[in-house]
């Protein structure tokens, strides 16, 4: 039997291995105060996206939770898509808000600005767009809506590290832009997240978030410190930070490999409904839509190609179940399939995936 072609596969080199060894031997593995390599990673990422400030955390979920804690959403509404990983909605609930799920544009699977506009009420306080699969949302229209109604934009960029919008990196636009780092993500590390801040009060926001990232600890001098508010144990560890620093150096190159694969898929896969080819996209996911999804996935699995379903719509989960219909999202939730697009794919594997998708779709 052929070795299975993985849906995700991190691209790790010698530098990551060497840096891990240095951290291991140092005995300095974690820092709640965010010194050492964590601070270096924040500074390098800030340069990379061109933002005012960055706060590194231990996951994308933590990033969303902390970012939303910057604005008062208690008993207020936050508009977001239902087609996302469930932590996008969880972060709203954790901060006392109510998630309002709206539909997507079927061409991109990103939130539809027209549906945002229709869903605004006196209780609406924020918009939480998701750059689905690494495809940038229509930020211009979303920003216009936010300005018109005095709403805050918190972006979920868990898929979009290295993507661009208007010739600027994603992470350079919204008040707070939340990234996720994981072995399956474009920037791989054991686990991690980051908030990129773009605001005139970014220094004040950083001070607030540094305390909330480490159990509310503030005013630390040697072993003395104070706690003035609730916080969490959300800081990034040194192992993740050094891997992140190495990954950041080659991120654009690896994303270009993904784009080249996407270009081949776009030209040669005959499925009508698939993610558009766009040089701005980071292609964390390459999705197609098929009617006979279960059979299609089994057929590919039988010949050694791993696939995924990203995602079951959040409003269909038991915890969030809503009676209202979100038509494009629900259709996508039944038909969407993700196929391998990671940089470790060989040309023969890419050709095999294309041939197999065309055969069984």
Give the label of every model feature segment:
Residues 1-30:
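N-terminal "arm"/small-domain region of PLP-dependent enzymes with the aminotransferase-like
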Residues 10, 40-43, 48-54, 114, ...:
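PLP-dependent aminotransferase class I/II
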Residues 31-77, 83, 91-95, 101-103, ...:
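Phosphate-binding glycine-rich loop
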Residues 69-148, 152-157, 164:
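PLP-dependent aminotransferase-like
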Residues 83, 97, 104, 158-159, ...:
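Histidine-centered beta-alpha loop that forms part of the nucleotide-sugar donor binding/catalytic region
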Residues 153-155, 177, 307, 339:
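Hydrophobic faces of well-ordered beta-strands that scaffold small-molecule active sites
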Residues 155-189, 221-227:
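Conserved active-site segment immediately N-terminal to the catalytic lysine
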Residues 179-180, 193-200, 245:
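Short beta-strand-to-turn element immediately C-terminal to the catalytic PLP-Schiff-base lysine
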């Amino acid at each position: 039997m052929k070795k299975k072609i993985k849906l995700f596969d991190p691209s790790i080199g010698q530098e990551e291995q060497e840096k891990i060894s240095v951290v291991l031997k140092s005995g300095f593995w974690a820092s709640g105060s965010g010194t050492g390599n964590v601070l270096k990673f924040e500074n390098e990422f800030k340069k990379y996206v061109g933002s005012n400030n960055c706060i590194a955390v231990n996951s994308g979920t933590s990033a969303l939770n902390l970012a939303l804690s910057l604005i008062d959403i208690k008993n207020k509404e936050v508009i977001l898509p239902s087609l996302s990983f469930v932590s996008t909605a969880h972060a709203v609930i954790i901060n006392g808000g109510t998630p309002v799920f709206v539909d997507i544009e079927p061409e991109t699977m990103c939130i539809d600005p027209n549906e945002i506009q229709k869903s605004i009420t006196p209780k609406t306080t924020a918009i939480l767009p998701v750059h689905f699969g690494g495809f940038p949302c229509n930020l211009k229209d979303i920003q216009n809506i936010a300005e018109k109604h005095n709403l805050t934009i918190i972006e979920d960029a868990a898929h979009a590290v290295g993507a661009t919008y208007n010739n600027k990196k994603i992470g350079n636009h919204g008040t707070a832009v939340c990234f996720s780092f994981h072995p399956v993500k474009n920037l791989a590390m054991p686990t991690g997240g980051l908030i990129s801040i773009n605001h005139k009060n970014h220094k004040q926001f950083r001070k607030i978030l540094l305390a909330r990232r480490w159990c509310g600890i503030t005013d630390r001098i040697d072993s003395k410190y104070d706690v003035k508010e609730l916080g969490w144990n959300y800081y990034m560890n040194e192992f993740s930070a050094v891997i992140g620093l190495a990954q950041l150096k080659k991120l654009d190159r690896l994303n270009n490999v993904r784009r080249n694969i996407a270009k081949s898929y776009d030209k040669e896969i005959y499925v009508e409904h698939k993610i558009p080819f766009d040089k701005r996209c980071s292609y964390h996911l390459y999705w197609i839509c098929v009617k006979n999804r279960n059979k299609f996935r089994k057929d590919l699995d039988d010949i050694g190609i791993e696939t995924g379903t990203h995602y079951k719509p959040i409003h269909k989960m038991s915890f969030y179940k809503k009676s209202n219909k979100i038509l494009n999202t629900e259709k996508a939730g039944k038909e969407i399939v993700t196929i391998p697009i990671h940089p470790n794919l060989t040309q023969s594997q890419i050709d095999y995936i294309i041939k197999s998708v065309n055969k069984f779709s």
